[in-house]
Amino acid sequence: NQQDQLRHLSINQFIRPDLSWMLNDDIKVSKKVIFIPGASKSGEYKKWSSDKFAQVAKYLVLRKYEIYLTGSNLDLNTINEIIQLCPESINKINESKIEDFYQLCMTSELILTNDTGPAHIAGLTNKNVIWIANDNDISRSCYPLGDNVHKITSSNVKNISVDIIINKIEQILK
């Protein structure tokens, strides 16, 4: 991770960024789960399928959770696919700007994410984050920081089953 990389440069003190300046005073945690189902343009190989995200969304909706889908306009097709399969999911692309996204994460109980940039911001909230990633040198060396980041990896992210994610969710939200 980043701390190990800094140690190789003989930098032994690491200060976790304080993002509290991004918050407004109205932080009310509710039964919502944030999904980050996208990845960068060149990161298609990092994406867990829309179908699997939708299956997890259905599971959570049955347990009375709201599902907020976040990302950029590049993720609109993915988000629409999830909404088509789980219409109760809520498109929050317009609240995915960095200054809104951190606040949104702080009001959630859980964040489910691919290996993508916003996952690192989500990790800094110290909320429970399930990070779905390929098991390779890059993801092993650069994963989200945070005390509650739960890494689920496979040699190919597409091989990670819905059951594995649901089992982890059950452990976290019990």
Predicted regions and their residues:
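Catalytic machinery of carbohydrate-active enzymes
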Residues: 1-174
